[in-house]
Amino acid sequence: MAKQIQAIRGMNDILPTQSPLWQKVEAVLRASVAAYGYSEIRTPIVENTDLFKRSIGEVTDIVEKEMYTFEDRNGDSLTLRPEGTASTVRAGNEHGLLYNQEQRLWYMGPMFRHERPQKGRYRQFHQFGVEVYGIGSADIDAEVLMLSARLWEKLGISEHVTLELNTLGDPAERAAYREALIAFLEQHKDKLDEDSQRRMYSNPLRVLDSKDPQVQSILGDAPALMDYLGEESSQHFAQLRELLDAVGIQYRVNPRLVRGLDYYNRTVFEWVTNSLGSQGTVLAGGRYDGLVAQLGGKDTPAVGFAMGLERIVLLLETLELTQDIPAAVDVYVAAMGDSCLVEAIKVAQELRSTLPTLRVMSHCGGGNFKKQIKRADKSGAQVALLIGEEELAEGVVTVKYLRNDNEQQRVARNALSAFLAELTK
């Protein structure tokens, strides 16, 4: 027997038993962004490597360690997209979507990062994101946070996630704070772990996010970013908090919250959970007003967020909130004998036409009564429709209940659609 080829480590199949939960999550996401008037954008999986070097930052972990980068036959450096924001900005600039315009966009699709696989975090993962362009005021920051809160409500996990909020100021304020932070870290360099020492000059704000307990104890005396904010940034952050208070969205200001990508400014946020261990972030985002110009467009304010679907699916499974996921089939149609096969196929086709939301599976491949009922039960259907020679002669269908103890019954062929519509509503 030939050796089986396995999936690449960290890149997982989503099997038929798992896909209904994914479909439920995706449906909630699509319905939620539609309620806010956002439009979908789809971008290629492969982009020029420079796009991510210029946007994410060359000294970030993603660019330094995690990107899937290769040369094509023309010698061009290409990369499997590690995140969605840069591609959305590139597409917006390329097609004139962002020039003196407001855009509310969303995307969903696979991303790729070569990092250590762990539960809920994989090398191929699926990301859902929202991006808004052309609006610089705090009310749009509040809107994307309200939208994200709506997602948790619709998924039934509002009580299991909390919002953390911070501001990074504008680029000048951030630069001034960066110098003060470097000066502070230099005084404690011998107590920093290797990773923090490496980041101290290249990306010092990421040291604030260190998980090392000793580093965290040192940071208790570090300068506070809030002390370096100008009036405009302070007012922006204050207005955002006022709006969130007004609509009842609870949050915690976390002065050490920074984002791992270089392009963020002012508002940054994360939704976190205590239900998934140390890897608690389930959604993150913020404002990135300089990125559009950085990638060749006009200065354009922007804000957005992204979430990994694997994390959301894992959270729902961990919280045991998957019980209401419907089976893939509502009705299973079985022919009791070859002479009834054509009639069974006709019944299934008519039901698909008259009841388009009804999920109808036809038995194929023959087999005796016991085998067909076994397959019907395995399909997850609520009922099996049995058509034998007797039913054919009398113009009826036998309805066998598969999920309860109701006695089977016969239903006239011409009344079947109405019967099933009532049964499955």
Curated annotation (Swiss-Prot):
One BP annotation, GO: histidyl-tRNA aminoacylation
Main location as per UniProt: cytoplasm
Gene Ontology CC: one annotated term: cytoplasm
Record keywords, A-Z: Aminoacyl-tRNA synthetase, ATP-binding, Cytoplasm, Ligase, Nucleotide-binding, Protein biosynthesis
Gene Ontology molecular functions: ATP binding; histidine-tRNA ligase activity
Highest rank taxon of the organism: Bacteria
Reaction catalysis annotation: tRNA(His) + L-histidine + ATP = L-histidyl-tRNA(His) + AMP + diphosphate + H(+)
Keyword Aminoacyl-tRNA synthetase: yes
Protein location: Cytoplasm
CDD domains per record: HisRS-like_core, HisRS_anticodon
Pfam families: HGTP_anticodon (PF03129), tRNA-synt_His (PF13393)
EC code(s) of this entry: 6.1.1.21
NCBIfam families, per the entry: hisS
Subunit structure comment from the entry: Homodimer.
HAMAP family registered for this protein in UniProt: His_tRNA_synth (MF_00127)
Similarity comment text for this entry: Belongs to the class-II aminoacyl-tRNA synthetase family.
Protein's name in the database: Histidine--tRNA ligase
Organism of origin: Shewanella sp. (strain MR-4)
